[in-house]
Amino acid sequence: MEQDDPVEALTELRERRLGALELLQAAAGSGLAAYAVWALLLQPGFRRVPLRLQVPYVGASARQVEHVLSLLRGRPGKTVDLGSGDGRIVLAAHRCGLRPAVGYELNPWLVALARLHAWRAGCAGSVCYRRKDLWKVSLRDCRNVSVFLAPSVLPLLEDKLRTELPAGARVVSGRFPLPTWQPVTAVGEGLDRVWAYDVPEGGQAGEAASSRIPIQAAPGPSSAPIPGGLISQAS
């Protein structure tokens, strides 16, 4: 599979999910029961979000979480996970020193699960999970942003990031790359691949004077630098 091909990556993701569903049906003996659990976790809150902005929950693997941390570790400032699901990335970020760490998730069941995980880890008072539509979250004070979103919403996310993020911020996108931004570095293969993007110095991303913005590559010890260094602005 081509490393940066979102179509092939999405196909692989669907194949993985199908295999998991088949195993679930075989073990439970009832597709209805599986569907009930699935709907309970994924549907609350979606009715208030336009269809094109809905992002289904698929938890990050341990390898994906580690790749995210490898690209953010040691960076100062606020870290946020947009669509934080069960909170595993936020909790891991706090543990490796990325503080404050905040997760935004619309599904109330997943927010509750994330808070339970934080409580069990002894971090209930240290990490923050907020039930909020990620499209309504202000990113103007964020220095580090992680996202694991569907390819269909990434063009809209680019607009939000470009408009709101301050200079020097870093965006880490898992599973699928941002469609028009040029990454400074990447780590992992296939669905475990994670890309890093830096907002240039000299103003917010939406305030660039030219149509292409130079950025600084800062690969981590386990990451692979990517040639180039330009973020394409929307016309």
From Swiss-Prot:
This is Adenine nucleotide translocase lysine N-methyltransferase. The keyword Secreted does not apply. SUPFAM superfamilies: S-adenosyl-L-methionine-dependent methyltransferases. It is found in: Mitochondrion membrane. Belongs to the ANT/ATPSC lysine N-methyltransferase family. The keyword Protein transport does not apply. It is an enzyme of class 2 (transferase). Keywords: Membrane, Methyltransferase, Mitochondrion, S-adenosyl-L-methionine, Transferase, Transmembrane, Transmembrane helix. One of its GO terms (biological process) is peptidyl-lysine trimethylation. The chain crosses the membrane at residues 20-42. Residues 215-235 are annotated as: Disordered. It comes from Homo sapiens. It is a single-pass membrane protein.
